[in-house]
């Protein structure tokens, strides 16, 4: 009988510890009043409203520290569709290839962490050109507050022009694939929409989907 009671006590104690640990590691929740309703709003604009939410900012993990000397690619210029120059972190395929992966940054900007992710895709995929577009034109945030300001202040027309320019830079025969995280996840899907028939695949990591089904 005592053995049974000890076993039951141990099970209850274990369950309590697991429950406590679960609660301890939970991310902060967003109150219902802070949720932005944007079903009738342009998707490309809705994410900028999210950037004004403090709890939204708290959900972002600080970027990993990367040694720039270990990076494979270089910064290259290209022509954006608005007539102004753009730039991207670029790793060309080892042999000529019409496959292009467009990588879109998180809300921090085109930092070394995103460049490292681009490098990893290059290593994993092999015969592909990897192009991480600089959506903030050289600006990079180091804190959530500065990232919020960059994301809120980003010019929508400019970012569309950058993606259009990147697709054109890849060439009319290029097969376009895209990937991005959060801010970049939303833009990954927008890249596929902009690329049209050239788009062959798009991966969104916790990004906002397109609400306009006609697109």
Describe the function of each predicted region.
Residues 201-215:
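The feature captures the conserved acid-bearing segment of alpha/beta-hydrolase catalytic domains
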Residues 190-200:
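Conserved hydrolase catalytic core segment
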Residues 175-177, 200-203:
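Residue in the alpha/beta-hydrolase core beta-strand immediately N-terminal to the catalytic nucleophile
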Residues 1-4:
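Positively charged n-region of N-terminal signal peptides that target proteins for export
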Residues 180-184, 188:
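Gly/Ala-rich beta-loop-alpha elbow adjacent to hydrolase catalytic centers
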Residues 14-26:
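Bacterial Sec-dependent signal peptides at the C-terminal "C-region" and cleavage site
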Residues 111-115, 186, 213:
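Short N-terminal helix/helix-N-cap motif within the alpha/beta-hydrolase-1
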Residues 27-55, 61-69, 74-171:
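Serine-hydrolase catalytic machinery in alpha/beta-hydrolase-like enzymes
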